[in-house]
């Protein structure tokens, strides 16, 4: 159990740091478009979880520590629903209703599409 906990923890640290770096970069370069950091990590995370899920279906012998470290740890640290929700509320509160609705729609449907695309890539 300890190796599994370590794998998830290390993956979580890496994913969280990547999300933090992405947010800092976007805020430094595109402060008016703060929401694009969350959108980017969530869409990329959805693509990656689709790819990993498909690969692990093909290769079930991949150790649970690797699977959990990547899917639960890394992708769990990288992606975030709470930040997506806060970004949407911030856009709504600033009166940018069409942008908020578009952002929410792209996040949800883009995430679903990216997950499907990632899984489909493993079936080529």
UniProtKB/Swiss-Prot annotation:
Fluoride-specific ion channel. Important for reducing fluoride concentration in the cell, thus reducing its toxicity. It is a multi-pass membrane protein. This is Fluoride-specific ion channel FluC. GO terms for molecular function: fluoride channel activity; metal ion binding. The keyword Disulfide bond does not apply. Na(+) binds at residues 76, 79. It is found in: Cell inner membrane. It comes from Pseudomonas fluorescens (strain Pf0-1). Belongs to the fluoride channel Fluc/FEX (TC 1.A.43) family.
């Amino acid at each position: 159990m300890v190796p599994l906990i370590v794998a998830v923890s290390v993956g979580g640290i890496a994913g969280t740091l990547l999300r933090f770096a992405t947010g800092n970069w976007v805020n430094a370069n595109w402060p008016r478009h703060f929401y694009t950091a969350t959108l980017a990590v969530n869409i990329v995370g959805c693509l990656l979880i689709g790819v990993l899920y498909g690969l692990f279906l093909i290769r079930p012998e991949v150790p649970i520590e690797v699977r959990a470290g990547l899917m639960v740890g890394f992708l769990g640290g990288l992606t975030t629903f709470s930040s997506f929700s806060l970004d949407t509320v911030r856009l709504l509160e600033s009166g940018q209703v069409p942008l908020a609705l578009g952002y929410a729609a792209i996040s949800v449907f883009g995430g679903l599409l990216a997950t499907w695309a990632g899984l489909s890539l493993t079936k080529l």
